[in-house]
Amino acid sequence: MSSSAMSRRSVLRGATAGGTALALGGLATAAATAAATTPASAPAAAAAAGGPSWDPTHFGSSYTARPPDPGAVLLGGPGFAVHGDGEGDDTAALRAAVDEASRRGIANKLGDILGGARDFPYGDGGGVVLVPSGTYRLTGPVDVHDSVRIVGFGARRPVFVLDAATPGYATGTARDVFSFRRRPVGGPVSYANNDTFGSGLVNLDIRIGPGNPDAIAVRFGGAQLCLLQDLDIDAGDARAGIDHNANLIHRVRVRGGEVGLHAYAASAGWQTTLLDCRFEGQRRAAVSMFNDAKLVVVRTAFSGTPRAFESAPDQWQHLYVQDSHFDGVSDAVAVLNDSASLPGAQNDLIRRSNQLTLLGCTATGTRDLLLLAQSGARTRGPQPSGRIRELTYGLRVEHALGPRESRREGVYADVARGAPHSLIRAGLRADTPPPPPVHEWVSVADVAAEMGRTIGAGEDDLDVFQAAVDRHETVFVPLGRYLFTDTLKLRARTNLIGLHPRQTWLLAADGHPHFADPDAPRALLATPRGGRHTVSGLGLDTARRTAGSVNLLWQSGAGSYLADVVTQFVKWHPEDVQSGDPGYTYRGAHKYGIWVRGGGGAMANVWSINGWAENGLLVEDTDVPTRLYEVSVEHHETREVVLRRVRNWSFLGLQTEDHIYGWRSQAVEIERSADILLAGSVLFRVATVQGPYPYAVGVRDSQRITLRGNRGYRDKTPEFTQWGAALSDTRTGRTVPEVEFTLIAT
């Protein structure tokens, strides 16, 4: 029988408003059974050999040599001696290195991070610890302070080991190995929260030995730009690989543990993106979700575990999964609560907050795709392997904004038999490349030395940077602050690399005439049209009085990558603000935040919060297929994201925020565009916002606009904090009023 003949489209729990319910064979409903206590056979041998044959992703060291950054703290350097042999205790040395990196930091969380004010004195602000290859034994938790990044390097990643039966990890109380923390000046140390920015673990491995049942490899957390990237976590018989979550978890493999990730709502209620990750051999579930974790999961594989995802009782979830693979998941891919069973489910907003999307996924040796815990209803997948073209649970609004608009709730499944390795590999193939090899990097500081110049001292550094990018393909920018009086223009193949965007700033000269004319916008950093670039690890600050300034003009073509980039953090506000919050003492003038003109590629972990710009992300005149992962745009007066004449763009994990005085700001505006996807979005309005807005996403003269999943329900001043509608056609005035939905498709 052909695969097309095996295709099944199924909808459970009826349809409303013109939708037709289908139930075509193959959709089984059975009593719920307990999860298997023994994981399905995990492909351990294949993993030991580098990965199963269906996996195209290389997991190895992303920094094979030491990055040439003199401002970073070197573990093993003077004052931070280590054993590095897996025998001696290196805990104290690593803690001291983290403390020193934090002390060196150039950004104070009580200044331009928390409030947006520029006049607070600097304090512990963050930095980088570089860790060479080796095996480092730890005997207790290591706090990763706000805006500190621990970055490994070498042909083999450094490995941090919690030895067998380490005291303190078998007491019945969970205990961390690495803990993301916030340490404000003069305040108490706490776990990372919504005032924590830029912390990270990058390019290192963590191994938990036997006899540590309460160990957690990483207690993650933070508000923006926080990062777990290029990690292998061997959790063994420990409690969890990762507990709590923040912005981006990228190229992370977790083996073993009771659960791989114990997920919560990230700080301030944002989503978390899991990108190119692998979970294998968890005893209970790969991902256990508590209070609406809002996960966006892309190109991630789950192997040899009873459940890929499970929700805590009485909790709704916003779960979006795309281009992922399930191998030997023995109980069910996703275990969710029945929406009708949720406390308060008589409220449509609460019931519809329970959302699942599986899109473009594959499965082998995995029978059930969805289990609804209270009713026991199971949605079966094709055997022995199959394609999950689309499976949703929740409200679907199809043919939206037109005369054929329809609504239905429940389970919808479109699956087909057969998932050959070639198809699995194609789905998992990444578009987010690792950084260029370190041996190809040329430090801009070395170019300055060749020119007899000093940079980062408050004078104009533009000619040194321009010489560096003109002469070299990959230019490294050390930690520091660098002043420009005009645009730094990259060549067709330039890469510009930093290690930490909160500690590596390119700054516009305040009040300079080159950035003064709003009718002739001029960028601080610009890429040429159609080029191929990697730009990462940088902060872009257009100062204060630069009415024509643009933080970044991105015209790069397919295959380009913009990642781990931030603008200055300032919030728009009116002149008559009564608040004493220092965040509203700053007044600026800027044109755009990030301006994409004819370009695209891939973007990840980007934070555009220059609130005095007209918008945070303006995309114009492009049909370059582009995916954006975990992009945050906040605090502007009237527009956050604007798309004009754009095709083939996908936003996976878009977050916007309207603050107290920014209540007139629209989340997304789309004009004369087509084939746009917004998936797993959090279009947020703070509890103190001072007025309503009629809709979140406005479209005009556009086709095939798709919204998949959205957090819209707020129980605090809902007349202001909830959008008047999710989607509006600004030409006809027609709207889709539901702000909680699994699918809206025009």
Residue map of PLM features:
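Beta-propeller domains
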Residues: 250, 259, 269-271, 293, ...
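Classical protein tyrosine phosphatase
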Residues: 148-149, 153, 485-487, 491-499, ...
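Tight coil/turn sites that cap or link beta-strands
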Residues: 133-135, 147, 479-480, 493, ...
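Flexible loop/turn segments at secondary-structure boundaries
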Residues: 137-139, 483-486, 505, 514, ...
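Extended hydrophobic/aromatic segments used for targeting, binding, or gating
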Residues: 652-672
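Long, structured stretches of catalytic cores involved in phosphate-ester chemistry, encompassing
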Residues: 626, 669-680
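Extracellular "leader-to-stem" segments immediately downstream of a signal peptide or signal-anchor
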Residues: 2-128, 143, 149, 153-209, ...
